[in-house]
Amino acid sequence: MATFKDACYYYKRLNKLNHAVLKLGVNDAWRPSPPTKYKGWCLDCCQHTDLTYCRGCSIYHVCQWCNQYGRCFLDDEPHLLRMRTFKNNVTKEDLANLIDMYNVLFPVNQKTVNKFINNTKQHKCRNEYVPQWYNHLLMPITLQSLSIELDGDTYYIFGYYDNMKNINQTPFSFVNLIDMYDKLLLDDVNFNRMSFLPLILQQEYALRYFSKSRFISEEKRQINHSHFSINILENLHNPNFKIQITRNCSTMSVRWNEACKLVKDVGTYFDILKTSHVEFYDVSPRCRMFTQHKLKAVSKVIKPNYVTSNHRALATEVHNCRWCSVNNNLIVWNDFRLRNICDNILNFIRALIKSNTGIGHCSSQERIHIYIRDVFDVCDESKWNASVVGIFNCLEPVELGNAHYILLNHEVNWDVANVLIQNIGKIPQILTLNDVITALHSMIYDWFDVRYMRNTPTTTFTVDKLKQLCARRKTVDYDSGVSDVE
């Protein structure tokens, strides 16, 4: 059993404040939610289990039981998960406030210990001090947290997470902030709590405390598209697709890291809870991460042999050719923008090949083919640059002075011609490597200008940022007929 979950279950009965704050979905009647095979720690109840996606941010971080309350660490309501979430520069004072909150919600004193021991003996006829019966008393106060970085903002979700060596398929990594506080002060807090426990339980408490307070922080995990709801990935091909998210909101107006102080003023806390409500947002999936996912999908299904062919048709419209025909039934082609990018890039590269080499058939096995797939993923700059340089060198450039040049005297389609005119001023007959890079960049940036995109989608915005975008009507920056340039 998860220690944090058990502590919330038993301490919830202590008083009115605890009953409101420590209410977890995992301790209530089960309501079904989409099952998944993602393993990790539920941020709400801290147990290691199968996770489902959060309705607030679309990241897999909540178990199927806690999902019924729809809590997210990015909410603007003072529920327990939000009060345990700290942001960016965490100070010693912030950590002291967190420890105070733990002491308020999970007190360990003689009265509390006697009450729990008497209840256990009375109801279960248990006269021994077996740790599993007193799991709720054995939750030490630590500065153990799961951390995630979202576009420059780092979030720390504090809690007591068991079994830290278990499989972690989430973008959250364990971080120990004890050095930001004071080891001796934290030791003193826990030794004081431990002194009220029977000797056998003291030993177990000490083992748990030191194992969770002296560990070395993990390296940051890189968030990627697989950490988000599969529903999003399945609909990315639709240019009009919107992500629907819900956020728990209230009139809480404290500094982000000071939310945990609200439990010290019970009256104010319940006044804020009375203003709690749910807000719904439709946001765009446009971000660097999902754009890269789409561009990689294109690179996997194109036919590199097209660049050495003589077909009159565009790359996505070639039929009955063993080497050049693509499967037009694939869902990736439902996005006309990806189709346009594919047609233009391959048309431009083919024109360069025809202008500078004698290759004349799509069945040819050429060295240049190995560079074609990587020229679509502009988000991976190093690999993209290497592929463009590889293509350029395969065209046997001529050196004049300190520069290398290639020819362009083969026809290109109208879209490619417009790109060249827009960026170079005319359709040139001689190109440098920089000209080629500029042209290829423009063919992608016209639709997906990743230079100005967030890495993660707007589902990871805080509520105040979502409200700002909503006020300017920019939560959904999509239009099926307008490119980034337009």
Curated annotation (Swiss-Prot):
Primary localization: host cell
Organism of this sequence: Rotavirus A (strain RVA/Pig/United States/Gottfried/1983/G4P2B[6])
Chain residue ranges for the region called Important for cytoskeleton localization: 82-176
Location of the region described as Zinc-binding domain in the Swiss-Prot/TrEMBL record: 42-79
Motif position, pLxIS motif: 480-483
Name assigned to this protein: Non-structural protein 1
Subunit structure of this chain's protein: Interacts (via C-terminus) with host IRF3; this interaction leads to IRF3 degradation. Interacts with host IRF7; this interaction leads to IRF7 degradation. Interacts with host CUL1 and CUL3. Interacts with host BTRC.
PTMs per UniProt: The C-terminal region is phosphorylated by host CKII/CSNK2A1. Phosphorylation of the DSGXS motif is essential for host NF-kappa-B inhibition.
